[in-house]
């Protein structure tokens, strides 16, 4: 029983974590967040479904297409919704813009793909495997491995490539990076592209385990935001731990109490973190210069 809760909770938690990782990418470079991150996941899943169902693409060949689409969509969000707000130093403009764009993307998806939930053909056998008394789907293993690989690849990119080092430099001190000749506006656009790429990738990971539709991104995006706050927007490890905590707590609540209450413990934890450690469990407290 415990093994089943842990296995299911870890799979769910890693999806939350990889979406929340996108929040961390944009916050580090620009101090902003894409509140339409859930819609980036939804669009990735629906574009992936179209590639597989309509164009007959193999699931594995479809993933690069979805990732490229995610980067284009993320760049569009930054150029249209975030950059104008940053230029005029608006504290709330980017919030309203990203929310509005998320609503627009959802409405566009409803008009293109309809409002009905659609099944996504799984690339792996859906027959569960028994491990330590837990029934684990091969797709759940793929979700965990895929999420970890994606986050590790982004970290490798940031640490080992010249473009990644520009992202890190901008995250550390945007003004200093600009003085060193780094195009910080381009770096911020790129961070939004990477953020939406991770969300779109998460969409095609989770789609075979759920139904795909225009409404699938809202709840996932909100929970990923909670994970980012719980773990800490400045900590990659915190994002992973926060995702695992929320995923396992939700699964345990649904198993022992009721699925109708599975969202409650996570929200309570979010409120407690905001009240007692606003920077997150692993986040660094901001130092105010005077």
Where in this protein do the model-derived segments appear?
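Membrane-interfacial amphipathic/re-entrant helices at transmembrane-helix boundaries
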Residues: 1-19, 47, 58-62, 88-92, ...
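Short, non-helical or kinked segments that cap or interrupt transmembrane helices
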Residues: 25-45, 59, 88-93, 163-166, ...
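Alpha-helical transmembrane segments within multi-pass membrane transporters and channels
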Residues: 57-101, 108, 241-246, 277-278
């Amino acid at each position: 029983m415990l093994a089943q809760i842990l296995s299911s909770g870890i799979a769910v938690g890693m999806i939350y974590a990889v979406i929340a990782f996108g929040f961390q990418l944009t916050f580090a470079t620009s101090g902003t967040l894409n509140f339409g991150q859930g819609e980036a996941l939804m669009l990735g899943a629906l574009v992936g479904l179209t590639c597989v169902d309509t164009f007959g693409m193999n699931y594995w060949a479809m993933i690069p297409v979805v990732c490229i689409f995610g980067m284009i969509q993320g760049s569009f969000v930054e150029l249209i919704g975030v950059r104008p707000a940053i230029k005029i130093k608006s504290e709330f403009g980017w919030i309203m813009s990203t929310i509005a764009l998320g609503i627009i993307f959802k409405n566009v998806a409803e008009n293109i793909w309809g409002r009905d939930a659609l099944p996504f053909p799984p690339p792996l056998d859906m027959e569960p495997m028994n491990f330590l008394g837990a029934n684990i789907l091969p797709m759940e293993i793929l979700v965990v491995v895929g999420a970890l690989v994606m986050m590790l690849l982004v970290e490798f990119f940031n640490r080992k490539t010249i473009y990644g080092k520009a992202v890190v430099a901008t995250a550390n001190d945007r003004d200093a990076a600009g003085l060193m000749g780094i195009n910080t506006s381009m770096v911020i656009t790129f961070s939004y592209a990477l953020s939406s790429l991770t969300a779109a990738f998460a969409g095609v990971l989770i789609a075979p385990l759920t139904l795909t539709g225009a409404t699938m991104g809202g709840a996932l995006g909100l929970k990923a935001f909670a994970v980012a706050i719980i773990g800490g927007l400045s900590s990659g490890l915190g994002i992973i731990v926060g995702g695992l905590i929320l995923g396992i707590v939700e699964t345990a609540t649904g198993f022992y109490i009721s699925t109708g209450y599975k969202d409650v413990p996570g929200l309570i934890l979010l409120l407690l973190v905001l009240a007692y450690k606003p920077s997150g469990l692993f986040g660094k407290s901001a130092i105010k210069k005077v």
